[in-house]
């Protein structure tokens, strides 16, 4: 599996989650050429939660004939600007979205690690990070 394929598979699964869609959330992949614009559009135009699927680290996990086995950290960031997002009822907060992401993706393939929350003062946004471990074979 290629890294982009993994990210797209996860983003597609999240965009297919009715609870996230109804809560004004949209998942995008980090390696998209337009990721910054996509995040900005989601936060400023739709004024919902932007969910960014990333794979920041890889560690070799043995060897095999089919490719390179790796363990990767899958990071999903749920980003919101509360003053925009929370103006309408029925919208999910970044933390709400992160909890749904964690519970909907935790499986034998994706092992949930943690949820961590932070604030970015310059952009007035809240970022909630959901981390998983996943083993794949890069080919």
Which residues are covered by each model-predicted region?
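Oligomerization/assembly interface segments of phage tail-like spikes and tubes
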Residues: 66-84, 124-136
């Amino acid at each position: 599996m290629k890294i982009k394929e993994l990210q797209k598979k996860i983003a597609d699964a999240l965009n297919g989650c009715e609870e996230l869609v109804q809560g004004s959330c949209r998942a995008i992949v980090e390696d998209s050429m337009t990721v910054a614009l996509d995040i900005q559009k989601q936060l400023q135009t739709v004024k919902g939660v932007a969910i960014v699927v990333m794979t920041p680290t890889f560690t070799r996990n043995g060897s095999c004939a089919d490719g390179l086995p790796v363990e990767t950290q899958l990071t999903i960031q749920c980003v919101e600007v509360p003053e925009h997002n929370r103006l309408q009822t029925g919208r999910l907060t970044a933390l709400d979205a992160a909890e749904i992401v964690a519970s909907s993706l935790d499986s034998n393939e994706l092992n949930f690690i943690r949820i961590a929350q932070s604030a970015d003062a310059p952009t007035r946004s809240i970022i909630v990070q959901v981390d998983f471990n996943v083993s794949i074979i890069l080919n």
